[in-house]
Amino acid sequence: MIHAGTRPLRVLVTKIGLDGHDRGSRIVAAYLRDAGMEVIYTPPWQTIPGVVKLATEEDVDVIGISSLATDHLIVPKMMEALRAAGLGHVGVVVGGIVPEAEQSALAAAGVSRVFGPGAAREEIVECVTALGQKSRAERVDDYSEANP
């Protein structure tokens, strides 16, 4: 089920750092749109503060980061910035060329999943759907605890 609540899941698909190769992120954005999600797609070369600001303004459920070169190495800093902004509930996935040795550091930072080249459409959609639903449930739980 793509809808969690009353509106489609909202996914921010972006590239941080200096990598400008966007073919993979465009394909994934189309997969998610075709599955009924609302996709906010940014141009390349985004900054961490810019992604955090956009995630807040757009009230996203999941963030997908595309990395062709080494831009995934700054994702742990982005995860810290998301938590500092109160967005720790937002699911984060990374797609692209990420060496296996570096995937554990991303997981330790809070990245839910790393998709390599050739990841199946169904696998991506199922993962993002589950993360989006979890994000919304955690947001509701956080709100309920803060407003008894």
From Swiss-Prot:
InterPro entries registered for this protein in UniProt: Acid_CoA_mut_C (IPR006159), Cobalamin-bd (IPR006158), Cobalamin-bd_sf (IPR036724)
Catalytic activity: 3-methylbutanoyl-CoA = 2,2-dimethylpropanoyl-CoA
A Pfam entry, by short name: B12-binding
Tree of life domain: Bacteria
Enzyme class: isomerase
MF-aspect GO terms: cobalamin binding; metal ion binding; pivalyl-CoA mutase activity
Biotech and industrial use: This enzyme and the derivative PCM-F, a variant in which the alpha and beta subunits are fused into a single polypeptide via a short 11-amino acid linker, have potential applications in bioremediation of pivalic acid found in sludge, in stereospecific synthesis of C5 carboxylic acids and alcohols, and in the production of potential commodity and specialty chemicals.
Biological processes per GO annotation: acyl-CoA metabolic process
Signal peptide start-end: none
Entry cofactors: adenosylcob(III)alamin
This enzyme's EC code(s): 5.4.99.-
Domain B12-binding: 8-138
Keyword Transcription: no
Residues that hold adenosylcob(III)alamin according to the record: H21
Keyword terms, alphabetized: Cobalamin, Cobalt, Isomerase, Metal-binding, Plasmid
PANTHER family, A to Z: METHYLMALONYL-COA MUTASE, LARGE SUBUNIT (PTHR48101:SF1), METHYLMALONYL-COA MUTASE, MITOCHONDRIAL-RELATED (PTHR48101)
Protein task: Together with Xaut_5043, catalyzes the reversible isomerization between pivalyl-CoA and isovaleryl-CoA, using radical chemistry. Does not exhibit isobutyryl-CoA mutase (ICM) activity.
Subunit structure: Monomer in the absence of the PCM large subunit. Weakly interacts with the PCM large subunit; an alpha(2)beta(2) stoichiometry seems to represent the active state of the enzyme.
Family recorded in the similarity comment: Belongs to the acyl-CoA mutase small subunit family.
Record protein name field: Pivalyl-CoA mutase small subunit
Species classification: Bacteria, Pseudomonadati, Pseudomonadota, Alphaproteobacteria, Hyphomicrobiales
